[in-house]
Amino acid sequence: MMHLILADSELELMPEEIKKGRILLDSSLHHSLMKGLKDWKRRGRPDIVHIFLLIAQESILNKEGLLRTYVHTRNNEIIYVNPEMRIIKNYNRFKGLMQQLLIHGKVPLKGGSLMKMKKERLDELLNKIKAKKIVFSRKGKRKALQDVFEENVACIIGGFPSGNFISSVEKYADEIIRLHEEMLPAWIVAMEAIVAYENFMKLHL
């Protein structure tokens, strides 16, 4: 089983210090309002979460029942994604869904949840996952993923456009891996990790 975690993702409601109202923060729409926020240049990026989830949830690995996906936010919330969740491809509709999730803690509001959110730190989640933990970072070593994977593995990927993890992820890592000399988008790292694990598990034979 692969546990795929998007850590320190920049998914949040608009902070009250810039505007009251429960609206999803999006840097493409709220750029001028965000300049007074700490770390404003990296915040308000639901697009990263959207593309990451599209790739993860539509993967062969997920269809084979071997993937569990989580999104950890800068405000220490964990979003648990049901493997049966099919991500809305329209970005504006996806943002509406994320806004509803951040306000109410689950979607859909009635019936079984396809996504649920709880207040939880990244280390609390990692302590519950009994698997080898691999952090993807430019600070890591270049290694072939086939050489570091085990049958149960947790892959931690940064959910931010630039910079470093806010959380102390390195202290929980069994391996810190660098895929490339340049910083790669989160969804590319996720895609590389998923396909490498599919090959490790011989799903393409």
What are these regions (language model features)?
Residues 2-139, 198-203:
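RNA substrate-binding interface of SAM-dependent RNA methyltransferases
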Residues 9-11, 140-141, 162, 183:
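Conserved beta-strand elements of beta-rich interaction domains across eukaryotes
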Residues 17-19, 148, 168-170:
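Short coil/turn segments at secondary-structure boundaries
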Residues 126-128, 146-149:
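Short amphipathic alpha-helix with an adjacent loop that forms part of the alpha/beta core around
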Residues 130-131, 151-152, 172-173:
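Short, well-ordered alpha-helix to beta-strand connector turns
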Residues 136-145, 153-164:
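Long, charge-patterned amphipathic alpha-helical coiled-coil/hairpin "stalk" segments used as oligomerization
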Residues 161-205:
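Structured adenosyl-cofactor binding patch, chiefly the S-adenosyl-L-methionine
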